[in-house]
């Protein structure tokens, strides 16, 4: 996405960058389609991004010099010209449908054409380790708020407000749920399995986490122990702290899994403990790339390394600031 993309669009697409929560061995495909009106600046901008698991594999941007569906993963370059032409035409058709929907929603909400408005559509499917359908999902948002969603039964709709009820009634009369269910349970699964085969060297790999525990003295006689997991794939991982074998779920700080920028992920969990009691606490790491769960403790450095340890402590605030960017 270019640096000049509307802030609203950036916020709505940020969800796509968050790792999906999946069952071990399961895989998902998701598309995010977004249209943003910009009065006085021409037609609405329309963007599609497609993800297999946590990997972006296709993208369309109506603001591109030559708007086309394009590969965003090396393994997608195996698809031929017919595929890209078909997907480009589908994207352009959806773009026009979104333009109509933006005008329709202005009427539903009694809004003027002078303001900028946004529609986002997310849909996709998930399969288990055996390649069989697990679930499908499809939902719309308008101006950053839920609008209408297909329920998990893929037969009924949840409308978020009075305007969305109008849409729900129209779609119930048209049998839209049946149409979408047929796609999600069959065609979506077929394409997901195809993409998993094309990208199997990347998508089906398992990179075990590199782990360690760091030690950060506090100002009140306590210590923060932070358990790090770095460089792992896929994104699904569990970190827990235990005190003498009992989990400390309530007392633990746990950050969301973050992309590392190289196709792997990072995560940490921390707990505040009394000074001198560090050895009573253990970090436990669960990931499908590990032959068995890991158990870690903080290992105090030898006394001869105390100076280097102090220098390392001084450097941690820079790393912490980087992590929260």
From Swiss-Prot:
Residues in compartment: Extracellular: 25-310
Region described as Alpha-1: 25-114
Keyword Zinc-finger part of the UniProt annotation: no
Compartment list: Membrane
InterPro entries cross-referenced by the UniProt entry: Ig-like_dom, Ig-like_dom_sf, Ig-like_fold, Ig/MHC_CS, Ig_C1-set, MHC_class-I_related, MHC_I-like_Ag-recog, MHC_I-like_Ag-recog_sf
Gene3D superfamilies for the chain: Immunoglobulins, MHC class I-like antigen recognition-like
Pfam families the record matches: C1-set, MHC_I
Keyword Transmembrane helix: yes
Domain Ig-like C1-type: 209-297
Region feature (Connecting peptide): 299-310
Membrane spanning stretches: 311-324
SUPFAM superfamilies referenced in this protein's UniProt entry, alphabetically: Immunoglobulin, MHC antigen-recognition domain
Region (Alpha-2): 115-206
UniProt keyword list: Disulfide bond, Glycoprotein, Immunity, Membrane, MHC I, Signal, Transmembrane, Transmembrane helix
Annotated region (Alpha-3), positions in chain: 207-298
Cysteines paired by S-S bonds: 125-188, 227-283
Membrane disposition: Single-pass type I membrane protein
Signal peptide: 1-24
Gene Ontology cellular-component annotations: extracellular space; lumenal side of endoplasmic reticulum membrane; MHC class I protein complex; phagocytic vesicle membrane
Example GO biological process: antigen processing and presentation of peptide antigen via MHC class I
Protein family per UniProt: Belongs to the MHC class I family.
Subunit note: Heterodimer of an alpha chain and a beta chain (beta-2-microglobulin).
Annotated PANTHER family: HLA CLASS I HISTOCOMPATIBILITY ANTIGEN, C ALPHA CHAIN, MHC CLASS I-RELATED
General function of this protein: Involved in the presentation of foreign antigens to the immune system.
Name this protein carries in UniProt: H-2 class I histocompatibility antigen, Q10 alpha chain
Species of origin: Mus musculus
């Amino acid at each position: 996405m270019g640096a000049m993309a509307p802030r609203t669009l950036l916020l709505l697409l940020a969800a796509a960058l968050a790792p999906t929560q999946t069952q071990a061995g399961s895989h998902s495909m998701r598309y995010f389609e977004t249209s943003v009106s910009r009065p006085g600046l021409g037609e609405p901008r329309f963007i599609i991004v497609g993800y297999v698991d946590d990997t972006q594999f296709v993208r369309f941007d109506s603001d591109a010099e030559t708007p086309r569906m394009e590969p965003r993963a090396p393994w997608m370059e195996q698809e031929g010209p017919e595929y890209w032409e078909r997907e480009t035409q589908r994207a352009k058709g959806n773009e026009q449908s979104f333009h109509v929907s933006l005008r329709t929603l202005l009427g539903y909400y009694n809004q003027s054409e002078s303001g900028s408005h946004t529609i986002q559509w997310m849909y996709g499917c998930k399969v288990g380790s055996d390649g069989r359908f697990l679930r499908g999902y499809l939902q719309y948002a308008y101006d950053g708020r839920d609008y209408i969603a297909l329920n998990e039964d893929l037969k009924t709709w949840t409308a978020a407000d009075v305007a969305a009820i109008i849409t729900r009634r129209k779609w119930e009369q048209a049998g839209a749920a049946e149409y979408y269910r047929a796609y999600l349970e069959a065609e979506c699964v077929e394409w997901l399995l195809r993409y998993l085969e094309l990208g199997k060297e990347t998508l089906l790999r398992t990179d075990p986490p590199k782990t360690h525990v760091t030690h950060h003295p506090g100002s009140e006689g306590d210590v923060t122990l932070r358990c790090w997991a770095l460089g792992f794939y896929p994104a699904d991982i569990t970190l827990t702290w235990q005190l003498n074998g009992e989990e400390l779920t309530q007392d633990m700080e746990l950050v969301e899994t973050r992309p590392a920028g190289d196709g792997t992920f990072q995560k940490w969990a921390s707990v505040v403990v009394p000074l001198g009691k560090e050895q009573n606490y253990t970090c436990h790491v669960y990931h499908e790339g590990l032959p068995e769960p890991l158990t870690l403790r903080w290992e105090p450095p030898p006394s001869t390394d105390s100076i280097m340890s102090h220098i390392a402590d001084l450097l941690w605030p820079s790393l912490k600031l980087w992590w929260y960017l």
